[in-house]
A protein has these predicted regions:
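A surface-exposed partner-binding patch
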Residues: 1-85, 135-425
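Compact, glycine/acidic-enriched structural inserts
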Residues: 88-131
């Protein structure tokens, strides 16, 4: 069987592959063993198909290529830049289409996967795949590509295994590896409480509150728990006062660190804005949320952070928070067409309103092909689009405008998603 696919895949998608990806596609995917969550490397040959079955049109980001699966529907995907190079590896979640960047390179992403797979809350993934004695440990592939010894990687993985998230992520951040997802984990650790680990819909029912709205709101910020319910929770769970303690200052610090380097992830804005509001820094909160509301809803990690208690009519957590502060919004926000589309809750759902907004923007005369591509992208992946016929048009426009902008790789990826959509429907 031919294990060498780098040249064919690079030509198929007009990719400028890095050395580590060339090594991976040229057989390393079939020579190393992985017992972490993402252990299905067998998809590589199928990427040459006209409409690969691993492509999920309308769900996966249209500039990503799935390359490693977890056999439960999630994928590690290459995210491709305008120049055809892989700019990062993202974990795409099939249960909603959310994504989180794992690292700039495949080596970083596989290292983080090894870490998360042994963490106490994630240990069940260790049973996904038995070790193959004929293949090498995946850490042996990662180590030389990150320029360190196996011992360095084993120390970091070991810290995750013992639940020492802060110490483990200290090591990652010192090396500049997996920086975004490390910050995500540090925020999660800062806001984690015994209550979050023990809460479930049955507990909400026992307290006489709704799970989706009220209980998740309390889990997001325990200061929102009414005093009488705190007393009941103490009785039921036997927890101390510390059972509700969160470190919002630490969470804010990590969110701001992410935002200093990138502005495309909704969860960082959500956390930074809420932390500011808690300190009565309303203008700062509004500024963070106005930037955050313009990111994709698929970047918000709302289930992990328990921020999904917002009113779905607004489409996003940040949108509802801004609406709560609507009397204080500056005129440039209050009069913005995008904001008007978000809050027009009497006109269809958020998906319909926002998709229509971006299609209207993309259809304006005089826009560059690159700007059109960006607007069509947001038409499909701002708050999502639920109409198959519209998605066919969106993907077609992404392919056309990507090609006109000279972004051949993005054009070919969009065309592949379009072919898969036509095959499925």
């Amino acid at each position: 069987m031919n294990d060498c696919w780098s040249e064919a895949i690079a030509e198929r998608y007009s990719l400028a592959l890095s050395d580590d990806l060339r090594d991976w596609f040229d057989g390393d995917w079939n020579r190393f063993d992985c017992s972490s969550e993402f252990c299905d490397f067998s998809v590589i040959p199928s990427l040459m198909d006209a409409a690969p079955s691993c492509f999920w049109p309308g769900f996966m980001l249209p500039d990503t290529i799935p390359i490693i699966g977890n056999r439960f529907g999630d994928w590690l995907c290459l995210k491709v830049g305008n120049d055809g190079k892989c700019c990062e590896i993202v974990h795409w979640y099939h249960g909603g289409g959310d994504y989180i960047p794992f690292g700039r390179t495949l080596a970083e992403a596989l290292l983080y996967d090894a870490c998360q797979s042994v963490s106490p809350e994630h240990q069940t993934w260790g049973e996904v795949s038995e070790k193959d004695p004929s293949k090498k440990n995946i850490l042996e592939w990662i180590a030389p590509r990150l320029g360190v010894s196996m011992a360095v990687l084993e120390e970091i993985v070991g810290l995750y295994a013992r639940g020492h998230v802060v110490e483990a992520t200290d090591r990652l951040l010192e090396k500049g590896w997996c920086t975004t997802v490390a910050a995500r984990d540090r925020i999660d650790a800062a806001l984690a409480t015994p209550l979050r680990r023990k809460a479930d819909p049955k507990l909400a029912m026992r307290l006489g509150v709704t799970w989706e709205k009220e209980m998740n709101r309390w889990l997001f910020d325990t200061d929102l728990i009414p005093l009488d319910q705190r007393e009941r929770l103490h009785e039921i769970l036997g927890s101390s006062t510390d059972g509700f303690a969160q470190d919002w200052d630490a969470a804010e610090k990590e969110a701001r660190a992410v935002l200093a380097h990138r502005q495309d992830l909704g969860w960082a804005f959500d956390i930074a804005g809420w932390a500011a509001l808690r300190k009565n820094q309303t203008a700062t909160a509004i500024d963070w949320w106005w930037q955050g509301v313009q990111t994709s809803v698929f970047s918000d990690q709302s289930t992990r952070f328990r921020s999904h208690w917002f009113d779905r009519n607004f489409g996003k957590f940040a949108a509802q928070q801004l609406h709560e502060l609507r009397e204080l919004l500056p005129n440039d926000i209050a009069m913005d067409p995008y904001w008007s589309a978000l809050i027009a809750t009497e006109v269809g759902d958020a998906s319909q309103r926002i998709t229509a907004h971006w299609i209207g923007r993309a259809s304006q005369v005089g826009l560059s092909a690159g700007d059109c591509y960006d607007d069509w992208y947001r038409a499909g992946w701002d708050v999502g689009c639920h109409q198959v016929d519209l998605f066919a048009m969106i993907l077609d426009q992404l392919a056309q405008n990507g090609r006109q902008a000279g972004w051949e790789a993005k054009a070919k990826i969009a065309k592949t998603y379009q072919a898969r959509l036509a095959q499925r429907f």
